[in-house]
């Protein structure tokens, strides 16, 4: 009986050690040491993979910054319609950050003659027209996203914005600054290629390139859906990219960098 008791005690001690060891391994695999920071960002696009992106970010416990524009979505509505209210509310609850991508997704064309800029809205009542914007008009265009986001979620966006296509000039950047919004572009290595042709730029090559080339402090850029790409990027690439970057020692920050709270 004494031997049986000793065997039982040894069994329980061994089991406890194994359990604790397994738990520790599991925890450490989810919280790798990080000594670098990358900033994931997403522009609205057609929103076709918006739910998938949110699902992956939540599962990986990673935060991102979303740049919003009232773009037409795959459902036939628009990204800042009430029909997307719950989506944006959930992202707020999860702790993501948000910036303006201009309300009507206005593309910079060229500088104007007297300190203005020529812009071409992609959406809205003046879509496709090349228009002259002074500082007040450009400020209104950037700020409309902020105002609409407050209506949808009760929370303002960060004081940041991103010009569609990343097309800017010193005059345009100054206009945003005067309005109180800092422009946020992306790194060369941070261009994740989800808007490129699928045949020429397949997902496996995009994943390999980004996993290798992204560097400390880089801002990445992808979309919540692209009309032209046949092979959707996010479902095939995003999660593995996050895992690969974690393995390389990256944490994930929020924009603007001055207000970044790193996630694992």
Positions of predicted regions on the chain:
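Acidic-and-aromatic substrate-binding clefts and catalytic sites of carbohydrate-active enzymes
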Residues: 44-49, 70-83, 106-111, 160-170, ...
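Histidine-centered catalytic micro-motifs
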Residues: 97-105, 165-168, 221-224
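His/Asp/Glu-enriched short active-site or ligand-binding loop at hydrolase and phosphoryl-transfer sites
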Residues: 167-213, 249-261
């Amino acid at each position: 009986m004494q031997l049986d008791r000793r065997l039982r005690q040894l069994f329980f001690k061994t089991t406890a050690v194994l359990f604790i060891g397994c738990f520790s391994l599991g925890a450490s695999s989810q919280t790798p040491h990080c000594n670098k920071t990358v900033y994931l960002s997403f522009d609205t696009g057609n929103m076709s993979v918006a739910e998938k992106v949110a699902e992956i970010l939540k599962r990986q416990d990673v935060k991102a910054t979303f740049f919003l524009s009232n773009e037409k979505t795959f459902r036939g509505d628009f990204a800042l319609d009430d029909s997307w209210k719950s989506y944006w509310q959930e992202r707020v609850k999860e702790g993501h950050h948000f910036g303006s991508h201009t309300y009507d997704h206005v593309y910079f064309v060229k500088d104007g003659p007297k300190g203005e800029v020529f812009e071409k809205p992609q959406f809205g009542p003046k879509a496709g027209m090349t228009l002259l914007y002074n500082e007040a008009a450009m400020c209104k265009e950037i700020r409309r996203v902020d105002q609409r986001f407050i209506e949808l979620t009760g929370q303002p966006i960060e004081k940041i914005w991103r010009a569609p296509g990343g097309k800017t000039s010193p005059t345009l950047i100054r206009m945003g600054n005067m309005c109180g919004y800092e422009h946020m572009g992306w790194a060369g290595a941070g261009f994740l290629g989800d808007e490129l042709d699928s045949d020429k730029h397949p997902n496996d090559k995009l994943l390999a390139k980004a996993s290798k080339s992204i560097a400390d402090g880089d801002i990445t850029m992808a979309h919540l859906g692209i009309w032209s790409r046949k092979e959707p990027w996010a479902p095939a690439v995003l999660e593995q990219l996050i895992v690969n970057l974690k393995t390389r020692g990256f944490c994930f920050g929020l924009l603007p960098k001055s207000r970044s709270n790193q996630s694992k």
